[in-house]
């Protein structure tokens, strides 16, 4: 979204108060309801709803009423909040043209009351070209999700911290002035992007300066991570200025060597393609030495508090291991003496164990005698119960058999005959029952059956064909020809006279004589 600060002059204090209320509500709401905005803004006489309408008119708020009536900040509204704060601090007073666009930021020229030109960088994460920010950067850390505005704010904070630390340590970077939310104000570096340079007077000097800069960053415990021709500015004196720092990582990162080699190869490949310069030497990550711990001061990616604790724990373990190794020889001699004492103690323990086992066996025998008597009584009871149950089951089975015999006698099949056909023979059909039926019954095929039906039906007398004479044939041909001609003429007349209503009426009013005269012309 392009920054258009013209609407700043039309916004009142209540409007900015409402914007701040929406920003506060977005900490735990994706869409802030209107009721919450009113309570946070705390304006009188329904002024919040009026200011919401004006902010929505200038596209500073986004409205979504699908689930409930809610609003959220747009990037333009976030820009206005940051600019309002920077103006109140006296950092900038004028906003100029846009001088650069990147995959994650927009760059504008601003000026203060003294007409000193500066650069305003607005971070805009979440664009189509760079939506993998959550996977490629560690802004979220332990959080699962966050809004793009919050991620842009973290990126700006991180870049300002890196820029300030590098500037204080003498690196060729722009001068950091101030920041607020997702905006950074820095001095304007005089130069051109290296990607726009076609020819250099001293390519070897520039190449060596860039490689020395990579090594110097590594000596301070930092790796740029995106050291290419798009993030390097060069002036007319071939002096270098480094920009764009949110992706910097520490040399203690797990993939530090990969990032370091990638920065080196980017410069080598660019100089070879653009200036036909092949560097004979280039730095390697193994040769770099950490002289300063700048990554710890600014908490660069890859070196966190947990890593500091782990480093301290490892150092303590190493010290303990060294002490244990020194004492191991003395402990070996003491172990031999202890082994002899352990053998004597083991003999005494075996005697005690044997006595305990004998006592346990006697107790088990006594308990087994008592248990046998009780088990015998229980077995007798179970046998008596089983005998009684078997007798009862036999009596029930006899009663069921007698009932089934009576039901069979009562349910004897009654065969009713209708025109010599038994009705219930189809239920229990068997091939053996075919003997009872007439085996000499004729078998009639479908074809014979149909022929018999045709013979029985009455036949109509056939009409005799009447042969036509030649005169009648010619007369019929003439009639067909005349009919075809009349149809053709009517169709043509209908096509030509169809567009105009008056002509159509004239065609309908024509007499038969005119039509016949037209037909005779053929």
Swiss-Prot record:
According to UniProt, the name of this protein is Serine/threonine-protein kinase rio2
Active-site feature positions: 226 (proton acceptor)
Cell cycle in keyword set: no
Protein kinase domain boundaries = 93-248
The gene behind this protein is: rio2
Enzyme Commission no: 2.7.11.1
Q: Which reaction does it catalyse?
A: L-seryl-[protein] + ATP = O-phospho-L-seryl-[protein] + ADP + H(+); L-threonyl-[protein] + ATP = O-phospho-L-threonyl-[protein] + ADP + H(+)
Q: Which UniProt keywords apply?
A: ATP-binding, Cytoplasm, Kinase, Magnesium, Metal-binding, Nucleotide-binding, Nucleus, Phosphoprotein, Ribosome biogenesis, Serine/threonine-protein kinase, Transferase
InterPro entries in the record: Kinase-like_dom_sf (IPR011009), Rio2 (IPR030484), RIO2_wHTH_N (IPR015285), RIO_dom (IPR018934), RIO_kinase (IPR000687), RIO_kinase_CS (IPR018935), WH-like_DNA-bd_sf (IPR036388), WH_DNA-bd_sf (IPR036390)
Similarity comment text for this entry: Belongs to the protein kinase superfamily. RIO-type Ser/Thr kinase family.
- GO MF annotations in UniProt: ATP binding; metal ion binding; protein kinase activity; protein serine kinase activity; protein serine/threonine kinase activity
Please give the organism: Dictyostelium discoideum (Social amoeba)
Q: What class of enzyme is it?
A: transferase
Quote the CDD domains the UniProt record gives: RIO2_C
**Where's it found, cell-wise?**
Cytoplasm; Nucleus
Which Pfam families does UniProt cross-reference here? RIO1, Rio2_N
